């Protein structure tokens, strides 16, 4: 039996109507006025009137004071992300196969040409978002990676974010945030190279800009507030479980944190600990986590582990931790999550920053049908085919007959023409021509 010991008071809202109106107006203005409109929004919204595209000299100057230890940590994380992305790249194989005597088909796997990577800057400096996008695109073999981040508190791109962009391999770095950044990358403003794919997290306006431009460019995911679910049984450490719930709640006021458990004792202890841990956070994180846990936190008690799987797959959380015995069983049975973190040793924060798999993940139930950002997002699987004249004997006849059944006479005649050319003295059953 499934019961709620704590139920969310709200459902995350992104104020979609408001965001749509604002974004529609901004995109129209940027399309009409180009760079001038972008500069206007940069000054109006971010207090930035400096250079948009940073030169190599500017990048060196602005990152020269980044401590060696910080550089080493960022470099380590980039290697982790790159190594995982390269392993993903190797899983994509090109092949050719003879499907019928004389009919050969295959696939090629190629990177897109231009990618735009966005890293937000608001409450926090999102260093990890900088290398998650850029390093993965570079591992895919993308020739041109354009990176954007908001001027941090009106002072230009945060030096640590800027270093992360550079170290991960960004070819162009622009001091732009929000809708104007997404539009500039999509339209190729300042670079002359419109992006094929735009990726990266952001607020509701960034998410709406990506949604609005989808089709003109590819995107990673339709992202909402960050989510975490923790599955825990009686073997779990309540203090660690509570810490991990709070660790994700600090993302923002609308970030859900869910506990699914078969242990009432563990649930009670976690619910007692969470407010204590939140109270000890710095002010910015404390305010966000307090609202997130109060309004969106849930604790769900299940009678069996099968019920836990049922509820977990229904929620399809962005991040899913498992603090239980028999981790292999959970790996085999859970099917809907953005990324899975098995065992107490594997906290979401490790995946958010350092471990290797990408942290740009589906939210709001989208993990039921999609995965997160990966090297695959930057790759195209292109098919090809070739056949001999002899192979067209059967292929041509079947094609003509099906085409005429569909009423597509011009299609059928492309087969007729070849059969007449290649086998002038032969007779074939090509179907009944469509009446003119």
From Swiss-Prot:
<dbReference type="InterPro" id="IPR012131">
    <property type="entry name" value="Hstdl_DH"/>
</dbReference>
<dbReference type="GO" id="GO:0005829">
    <property type="term" value="C:cytosol"/>
</dbReference>
<dbReference type="Pfam" id="PF00815">
    <property type="entry name" value="Histidinol_dh"/>
</dbReference>
<dbReference type="GO" id="GO:0051287">
    <property type="term" value="F:NAD binding"/>
</dbReference>
<dbReference type="InterPro" id="IPR022695">
    <property type="entry name" value="Histidinol_DH_monofunct"/>
</dbReference>
<dbReference type="InterPro" id="IPR043678">
    <property type="entry name" value="Sulfopropanediol_dehydrog_HpsN"/>
</dbReference>
<dbReference type="GO" id="GO:0000105">
    <property type="term" value="P:L-histidine biosynthetic process"/>
</dbReference>
<feature type="binding site">
    <location>
        <position position="248"/>
    </location>
    <ligand>
        <name>Zn(2+)</name>
    </ligand>
</feature>
<protein>
    <recommendedName>
        <fullName>Sulfopropanediol 3-dehydrogenase</fullName>
        <ecNumber>1.1.1.308</ecNumber>
    </recommendedName>
</protein>
<comment type="function">
    <text>Catalyzes the NAD-dependent oxidation of (R)-2,3-dihydroxypropane-1-sulfonate to (R)-3-sulfolactate.</text>
</comment>
<feature type="binding site">
    <location>
        <position position="352"/>
    </location>
    <ligand>
        <name>Zn(2+)</name>
    </ligand>
</feature>
<feature type="active site" description="Proton acceptor">
    <location>
        <position position="318"/>
    </location>
</feature>
<dbReference type="GO" id="GO:0008270">
    <property type="term" value="F:zinc ion binding"/>
</dbReference>
<feature type="binding site">
    <location>
        <position position="411"/>
    </location>
    <ligand>
        <name>Zn(2+)</name>
    </ligand>
</feature>
<keyword id="KW-0520">NAD</keyword>
<keyword id="KW-0614">Plasmid</keyword>
<keyword id="KW-0479">Metal-binding</keyword>
<dbReference type="GO" id="GO:0004399">
    <property type="term" value="F:histidinol dehydrogenase activity"/>
</dbReference>
<keyword id="KW-0560">Oxidoreductase</keyword>
<feature type="binding site">
    <location>
        <position position="180"/>
    </location>
    <ligand>
        <name>NAD(+)</name>
    </ligand>
</feature>
<dbReference type="InterPro" id="IPR016161">
    <property type="entry name" value="Ald_DH/histidinol_DH"/>
</dbReference>
<feature type="active site" description="Proton acceptor">
    <location>
        <position position="319"/>
    </location>
</feature>
<dbReference type="InterPro" id="IPR001692">
    <property type="entry name" value="Histidinol_DH_CS"/>
</dbReference>
<comment type="similarity">
    <text>Belongs to the histidinol dehydrogenase family. HpsN subfamily.</text>
</comment>
<keyword id="KW-0862">Zinc</keyword>
<feature type="binding site">
    <location>
        <position position="203"/>
    </location>
    <ligand>
        <name>NAD(+)</name>
    </ligand>
</feature>
<feature type="binding site">
    <location>
        <position position="118"/>
    </location>
    <ligand>
        <name>NAD(+)</name>
    </ligand>
</feature>
<feature type="binding site">
    <location>
        <position position="251"/>
    </location>
    <ligand>
        <name>Zn(2+)</name>
    </ligand>
</feature>
């Amino acid at each position: 039996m499934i019961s709620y010991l704590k139920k969310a008071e709200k459902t995350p809202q992104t104020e979609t109507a408001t965001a749509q109106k604002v974004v529609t107006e901004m995109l129209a203005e940027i399309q009409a006025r180009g760079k001038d409109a972008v500069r206007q929004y940069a000054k109006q919204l971010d207090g930035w009137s400096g250079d948009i595209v940073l030169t190599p000299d500017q990048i060196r100057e602005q990152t020269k004071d980044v401590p060696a230890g910080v550089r080493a940590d960022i470099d380590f994380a980039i290697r982790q992300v790159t190594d995982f992305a390269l392993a993903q790249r190797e899983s994509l194989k090109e092949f050719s196969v003879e499907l019928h005597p004389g009919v050969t088909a295959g696939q090629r796997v190629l990177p897109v040409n231009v990618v735009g990577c966005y890293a937000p800057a608001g409450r926090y400096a999102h260093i990890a978002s900088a290398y998650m996008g850029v390093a993965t695109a570079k591992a895919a073999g993308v020739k041109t990676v354009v990176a954007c981040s908001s001027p941090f508190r009106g002072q230009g791109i945060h030096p640590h974010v800027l270093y992360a962009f550079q170290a991960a391999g960004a070819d162009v770095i622009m001091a732009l945030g929000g809708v104007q950044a997404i539009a500039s990358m999509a339209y190729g403003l300042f670079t002359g190279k419109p992006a094929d794919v735009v990726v990266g997290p952001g607020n509701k306006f960034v998410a709406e800009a990506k949604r609005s431009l989808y089709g003109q460019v590819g995107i990673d995911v339709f992202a909402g507030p960050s989510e975490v679910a923790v599955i825990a049984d009686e073997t779990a450490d309540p203090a660690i479980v509570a810490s991990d719930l709070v660790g994700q709640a600090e993302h923002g006021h609308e970030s859900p944190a869910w506990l699914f458990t078969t242990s009432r004792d563990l649930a009670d202890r976690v619910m007692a600990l969470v407010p204590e841990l939140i109270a000890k956070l710095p002010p910015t994180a404390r305010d966000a986590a307090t609202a997130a846990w109060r309004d969106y936190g849930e604790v769900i008690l299940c009678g069996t582990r099968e019920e836990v799987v049922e509820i977990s797959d229904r929620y399809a959380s962005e991040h899913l931790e498992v603090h239980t015995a028999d981790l292999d069983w959970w790996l085999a049975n859970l099917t809907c999550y953005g990324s899975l973190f098995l065992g107490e040793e594997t906290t979401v924060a490790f995946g958010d920053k350092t471990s290797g798999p990408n942290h740009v993940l589906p939210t709001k139930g989208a993990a039921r049908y999609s995965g997160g950002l990966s090297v695959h997002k930057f790759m195209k699987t292109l098919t090809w085919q070739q056949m001999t004249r002899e192979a067209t004997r059967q292929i041509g006849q079947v094609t003509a007959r099906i085409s005429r059944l569909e009423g597509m006479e011009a299609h059928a005649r492309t087969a007729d023409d070849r059969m007449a050319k290649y086998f002038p003295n032969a007779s074939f059953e090509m179907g009944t021509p469509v009446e003119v």
